[in-house]
């Protein structure tokens, strides 16, 4: 079960709009997730409308039983909310530790169990299926196991689909996760259990591994590991561990995980760390030249986590640790062949740039080669920016006027935009549209400057593009941010002409 849309949305600063929830739900089901927890009942009017929208789509497509909503032991209040939203499964939040019952609810276990039974009976009468969370189960099984067993024993005769065991405060480790889960599975072999990990000690994935080894059949995850505090077990890591480390067959389509993860990154505003396993930007990038050389010799530096499994490709970084093998791999991708002497000079220049902490992309290579081999960089360009003017005035939209040359022909256009660079790109698009030429889609835009906060520091702008289904990046470096972006854009224009 994926809970990105419920627990994941409890990440500080994250809130999904209705259309975003629907898009994420569709991506998760396309990925092969079996169940989705899409909301908590009673949260807000906006959440209610979002759940209605997702449920309406799920009803039309035959997926309504895959949607679940967190509900509370509150009589019929949560059930009314869930039913009105169009959902058919409640995940009832019950207390899984004696301390929570007596100190938070200020009730006896018997009173709490009676309240739970009442809600479950109402749900069944309405045709709403029931799973139950034993909230704070990890503390409960550790400090008051007799209460946990009493709770399960008093409720097991009811038509509960799954008993869900959350490590609510993320206190478990792989050793006691196995011990406690094994105890539940052994004691109640006829019941279905889920394990819900939290990542407070950075052990969520390891604990999932132990839970499965102990016999747990249901797992809770989130895309990108979003969730309360340190988050939940990330779906990307869990799917790889299940297949490679445990040999477990699932319905998950690995090649879809990167798309779903990037979608959530965009909607949540929470960036994926570049070194995050499976989905991080750098995890399929070889930096050391010896690794690239080994990859050319029967994949000596590859493990089972091949990037193609996850809809990605292996890359070879260019920097001070690069060797000729790294550079050759990137030149092959560009269809460029140079002799050994030229290769040595290019390698030296890339190492020099790396020492200065400058980022070198594949698309920079033709420029570096031209520079190193004393060619006229502009001579090989099919697209030139002849001149341009950018204006910014208080109370008025920025305006850009530009003149470019394409294959020897000059074209001129102007446009306004929400910023100077936006105006520049809009003017470019006008020219390309008039010529019937496709224009790449800008997918990401990042700016960085060296530490120190100097106003005259060089700005590095890295722009990600998608053209004809192919993703690539271009880089511009200048003391002016807009100039840096324009340089990156010019590289893009010539890149697509190759």
List the model feature ranges, each with a label.
Residues 7, 11-36, 57, 61-62, ...:
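Alpha/beta enzyme core
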Residues 10-11, 15, 20-24, 29, ...:
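Non-catalytic terminal/interface segments that mediate subunit docking, oligomerization
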Residues 169-172, 179-296, 301:
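Catalytic alpha/beta core domains of metabolic enzymes, predominantly
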């Amino acid at each position: 079960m994926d809970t990105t849309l419920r627990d994941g949305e409890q990440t500080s600063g994250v809130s999904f709009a209705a259309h975003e929830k629907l898009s994420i739900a569709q991506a998760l089901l396309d990925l092969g997730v079996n169940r989705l927890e899409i909301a908590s009942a009673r949260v807000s009017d906006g959440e209610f409308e979002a759940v209605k929208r997702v449920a309406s789509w799920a009803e039309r497509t035959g997926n309504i039983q895959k949607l679940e909503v967190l509900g509370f032991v509150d009589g019929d209040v949560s059930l009314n909310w869930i039913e009105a939203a169009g959902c058919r499964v409640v995940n009832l939040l019950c207390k899984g530790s004696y301390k929570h019952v007596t100190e938070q609810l200020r009730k006896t276990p018997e009173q709490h169990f009676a309240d739970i039974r009442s809600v479950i009976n109402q749900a069944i009468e309405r045709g709403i299926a029931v799973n139950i969370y034993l909230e704070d189960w990890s503390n409960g099984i550790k400090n008051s196991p007799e209460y946990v067993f009493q709770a399960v024993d008093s409720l097991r005769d009811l038509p509960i689909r799954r008993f869900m065991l959350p490590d609510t405060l993320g206190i478990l480790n792989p050793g006691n996760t196995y011990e406690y889960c094994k105890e539940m599975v052994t004691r109640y072999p006829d019941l279905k259990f889920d394990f819900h990990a939290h990542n407070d000690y950075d052990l969520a994935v390891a604990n999932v591994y132990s839970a499965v080894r102990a016999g747990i059949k249901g797992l809770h995850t989130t895309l990108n590991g979003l969730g309360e505090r340190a988050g939940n077990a990330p779906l990307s890591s869990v799917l790889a561990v299940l297949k490679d480390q445990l040999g477990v067959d699932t319905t998950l389509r690995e090649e879809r995980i990167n798309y779903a993860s990037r979608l959530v990154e965009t909607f949540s505003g929470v960036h994926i760390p570049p070194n995050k396993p499976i989905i991080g930007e750098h995890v399929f990038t070889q930096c050391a030249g010896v690794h690239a050389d080994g990859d050319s010799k029967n994949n000596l530096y590859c493990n089972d986590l091949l990037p193609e499994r996850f809809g990605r490709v292996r890359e070879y970084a260019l920097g001070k640790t690069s060797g000729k093998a790294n550079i050759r791999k990137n030149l092959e991708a560009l269809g460029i062949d140079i002799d050994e002497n030229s290769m040595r000079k290019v390698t030296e220049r890339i190492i020099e740039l790396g020492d200065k902490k400058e980022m070198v992309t594949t698309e920079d290579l033709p420029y570096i080669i031209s520079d190193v081999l004393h060619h006229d960089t502009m001579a090989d360009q099919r697209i030139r920016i002849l001149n341009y003017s950018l204006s910014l005035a208080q109370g008025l939209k920025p305006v850009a006027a530009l003149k470019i040359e394409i294959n020897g022909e000059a074209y001129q256009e102007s446009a306004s935009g929400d910023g100077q660079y936006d105006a520049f790109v809009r003017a470019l698009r006008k020219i390309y549209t008039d010529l019937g030429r496709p224009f790449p889609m800008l997918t990401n835009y990042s700016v960085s400057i060296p530490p120190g906060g100097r106003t005259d520091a060089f700005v590095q702008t890295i722009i990600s593009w998608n053209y004809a289904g192919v993703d690539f990046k271009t880089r511009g470096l200048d003391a002016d941010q807009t100039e840096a972006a324009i340089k990156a854009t010019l590289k893009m224009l010539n890149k697509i002409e190759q």
